[in-house]
Amino acid sequence: MIVKIIKGDITEIEAEAIVNAANSYLEHGGGVARAIVEKGGYIIQKESREYVRKYGPVPTGGVAVTSAGKLKAKYVIHAVGPRYGIEGEEKLEEAIRNALRKAEELKLSSIALPAISTGIYGYPYEICAEKMVKVIKEEYTNFKHLNTIIVSLYSEEAYNIFVNIFERELAKEKNITLKMSP
């Protein structure tokens, strides 16, 4: 398993799936969600609305899949993270776990994730990084297809926090190669 931590724009990453930090109604009006629709095209919002019409709102911790429009990825996996102080940290783990499992179910080899719930939902970067690395350590041995996880961070602050936590937590993991590119 290769885990890459990258400072940059998730919409520019070459991965088979990119994860969108979404709300339950898959209305992509702000943050990373808005950037994904702006770069990938309205088809992503259109498919998201069709999903919600057909299946109802995505519960916190859940995921939904759409095409990726004009993005380099094949799919967008919309993960609904929790709001800080309102919904528990276990829902953040669940959103990350479900996104990774969905990529494996789709037989994808690579996925890019943002710092889910750290924007308007208010989670500190430290908690998100700790939950993400915990889920990766718990799940990676179950994956037959997924072999590259890219964590894409927009700010210098987020990048530095994730690098420190991932270096500390993955130091003893022999089967995970950690790569960083600022």
From Swiss-Prot:
NCBIfam families: PRK00431.2-3. Pfam families: Macro. It comes from the Archaea. This is Uncharacterized protein STK_23830. InterPro entries: Macro_dom, Macro_dom-like. Residues 1-170 form the Macro domain. The lineage of its organism: Archaea, Thermoproteota, Thermoprotei, Sulfolobales, Sulfolobaceae. Disulfide bonds: none annotated.
